[in-house]
Amino acid sequence: MKSRAVALVIATTAVGLLATAGSATAGQGDTFCTWGGTPAAPTGIITLNPGITNTPSTGPIQFTATGPLGGSGCTGKLTFTGSFEPGATCAVGSAFHAKATGLPPVTRVEGQPSIAGTGPVLLYDAHGNVVGSEQAQFLTTLANESDPGYLNCNTPRGLTEAFWSDTIELFASK
């Protein structure tokens, strides 16, 4: 069972990295940032209340995801504060909505349903315009058995904290 979970996390992370790398040629003049470190050295932290388990949630799950920004023109700390819609599990995430602080002009985000902690996220400005995207990788270290979150999805309390990293693309102004 452990080997299947590890294989799923590794495969999903690889798909997320390929999707992010594939978008790197999307637009001339776009800005690319790291957020929460790298997959090899994640520094982002997400906290979840209540914790996510392997049973679909019956209500929203509140979360805060925060981490340092890196890359050319990307400094400071970005934070998402929001909630996952009912139905979230550790393996299949539900859509989410969040307020964003720390990366102007981004003020809010909308995440799509995801598999194993990776999923597309659209970044919006205060006027409702899409100004960027990011590929969430919330379960970056769960393949590591020394990670405290490794088995928490199987407990009644669930996964309440995890490390992650991802890449952000801010679209060039037209």
Features from the language model and the residues they span:
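Secretory targeting and sorting signals
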Residues: 1-26
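Cleaved targeting-peptide boundary
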Residues: 26-35
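Extracellularly exposed regions in secreted/surface proteins, prominently low-complexity, repeat-rich
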Residues: 139-174
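Predominantly extracellular/secreted and cell-surface proteins with exposed
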Residues: 42-138
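Extended beta-strand/beta-hairpin segments
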Residues: 35-36, 71, 168
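Processing junctions and N-termini across compartments
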Residues: 20, 27, 67-68, 83-84, ...
